[in-house]
Amino acid sequence: MRKTTNTIRIEGARVHNLKNINLEIPRNELVVITGLSGSGKSSLAFDTLYAEGQRRYMETFSAYVRQFLGNMERPDVDKIDGLSPVIAIEQKTTSKSPRSTVGTITELYDYIRLLFARVGTAYSYVTNQKMISYNEEQIQSLLLEEYLEQKVILLAPIIKSRKGHYRELFDSLAKQGFSKVRVDGQVVDLTPGMKVDRYKTHDIELVIDRFTVKKEETFLKRLNESLNTALHYGEDVMMVLRLEDNKARYFSKNLMCPTSGISYPIPEPNTFSFNSPKGMCPVCKGLGVQHKVNLKKIIPDDSISIAQGGLVPLGTKKTSWTYKQIETIAKCYHFELTDPIRKIPTKGMEVILKGSQEKFEIPSAVLGITRTYKIDFEGLEHYIESSYEEAATASIKRWASNYMDSYLCEGCKGSRLREEALNYRLNNCNIADLVGMDLKDLYTWISELDQSLNANEKKIATEILKEIRVRLEFLLNVGLDYLQLNRSSKSLSGGEAQRIRLATQIGSQLVGVLYILDEPSIGLHQRDNDRLIQSLLALRDLGNSVIVVEHDKDMMLSADHLIDMGPFAGKNGGEIISQGTPSETLKQNTLTSQYLSGKLLIEIPTKRRKSNGNSLFLEGCTGNNLKNIDVEFPLGIMIGVTGVSGSGKSTLVNETLYPILNEHLFNGVKVPLPYKKISGLKYIDKVVDINQSPIGRTPRSNPATYCGVFSEIRNLFTLTPEAQIRGYKPGRFSFNVVGGRCETCQGGGMKVIEMNFLPDVYVECESCQGRRFNRETLEIRFKGKSISDVLNMSINEACDFFEALPKIYRKLKMIQDVGLGYITLGQSSTTLSGGEAQRIKLASELSKKDTGNTFYILDEPTTGLHFEDIRVLLGVLNRLVNKGNTVLIIEHNLDVIKQVDHIIDIGPEGGSKGGELLFSGKPEELIHVERSHTARFLAKELELQLNTVT
């Protein structure tokens, strides 16, 4: 019998910068892969192990199915043995759909909808009375009980508060043998040609029968027939009108308010779905927001004229059809397009914005005739709104969104649901109340719910509540207690989305799977780190292998097996420099082991910088969970914004402060979250948000093009004698332009060979041998190097090569200084990690002329960075500050927090229990704040370092 292998064995892995490595990874253990940024961690974990696992999975399908699914490229590896089914849990945001929420992606909302559909109690949105439903027997019993010996009329409601003359309806009822109807409270005879005022709203009921209620057997037969007829014509709804006091009461087989007569259909799960027509708000179609045109964005400056571009969406294109229509409007309302907008008559401006279908006759003094002008113009506002709602392409929608703002839906107040769904309650809460709770509070509410249910409801709800509790527990265990189920998926950070997927996988209880995770600790405060580690260990204990690409110290020390890659990055990395248990790794002489043991550390500054005396002062911030806080941002120093996950850091900085600065300095269109006042804007002249988004989205984008150095290099090649003789321009040396590039591969350097049922194969272009340019272009050389040779240089090599050319050297030196000397000039931007992309952006900013009044914002810049990378990054940030600029960092990493000059701590908890300003001042002073979780961990770090130094 074949023995099951206890390891995953990799032989000859050469993906990206991997140096033909051979490796054995233990199965059913928590394995952490660490190393410098660019050392090959992701190449090993995702581009080798995961890629091969996915490829093998795809091969289990038939050739017919594979042609529809597409095929995956085989990773460059000789052999992988012992590979289990692979699931990768990456940092990608879950979904960009506005309909996707935390509740939908975790499936918790599905169970909550089911809970409300089965045991929720309906209330009238008119009277707030409990809704009731009856069957025929119950209605008959109630009539005999409550109306005995009383004269009543049985009515079938046909029209409820609608306009129309209803002549055809009355004629149809008369033909069916009915003689009377009740119109707006008055019983009238049906007469030929009868109709009512079509412009008024009416209530019309059909008179079915009129009698005195008795208990005689002959009467009961008549009553039963009349009830069935009334329910048939009233579509399961009927009325009883007592003649003594003219008081009506409704009865329905559906849920109905006995006083107002409104009815709800029998609830189903889709009654509470904002993605179903049965549940969604009819105003916003289940989105929770409405988009309306903002006039300030259409006319930012009313002192200039339309001809000068005063109507921003219109611009100055005088040949457009819209412009011609506005010329007609100007003639009709007697103004010139050269007049300042503020001087245009109110009516004329209204027609431009709202539209008109009018005809105008204007006499011409010159010709002595009268010309008729017809305005057939929908108005700029309507044009922009319809462009947004009916956009055929993403670019049109994006254009229209520049002139619109999002507002909370007036119909559902952001709940996404129609009125009926919001009036089902459980324990005094509707479904919107539940999805708006922090997950921690929701767990408490769900746990206590069965106390308010009767025996029958408990029996129905038991399994549903169990499923909800289990899923909530997993989310709480990965540190997401501050999220709400109605939180939009696209607003989640990569770390939050990853931990949601992790919780879902733990809940699936799969066994024998290989899980690969990419830095699950991103965005997680130290307080929650232990819970995350315990969740990963729980995944392992189920019988799974867990591989984590991670830089977090606690995660490394908790691993069963630690793989350290290096020794450096790029071409100088891609090797396994140590592996074993954490205790074995500590004995090695590697960068990682030295930082883990404390031999190397990022030191506390001997002196904190002082502000330049100026500040930004932001008052009355109330966005999301912020509790009306006033925050001062001292300028000219490094500021750290700290707090547990969900405390309000991103709300304060990314959603409030940055949009304000961007709007003030660059007319940014993003609307900041609510605040009262900001002062000190005059002290900054530029704001830069340096995030980890890619520097380009196509393989043709590279560090040289992003930093602007490639243009200088191309210009340099045109100045060579041979290029001058041939008349070559800069475009000749671009792989994106026809002429100089290789047309066989169109400047890509690689050709794709379609293999039908086998994966596509990428081969080196036979015409240019992967050099991207044609022979004539490659003949042009500068200092013996062709343009292709230059693109294949590492940044370190390029710095030496261009040292005598300040314009090029300065930009390359900045990339080298941020620790990216190992990447090549022409390296595709799609192969760069988030940390590498962020540092290239930093280098680009450093190379620009500096005013000394720039405000830099970085959100978790340590994502994907090793201890040594963080040290280099801090050196770069300190250079920016030393030039007089302000650097604001949102961060959990204690190595960064202890380096900043000023800390703003938000908390104390996440979600509704956060949003307070706990502290603003020096790091050494923060450690005395008892309510701050950051203070507790920072105190340990400062104490540890002092002891190490001592």
Where are these regions (language model features)?
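Conserved phosphate-binding elements of NTP-dependent enzyme cores
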Residues: 1-950
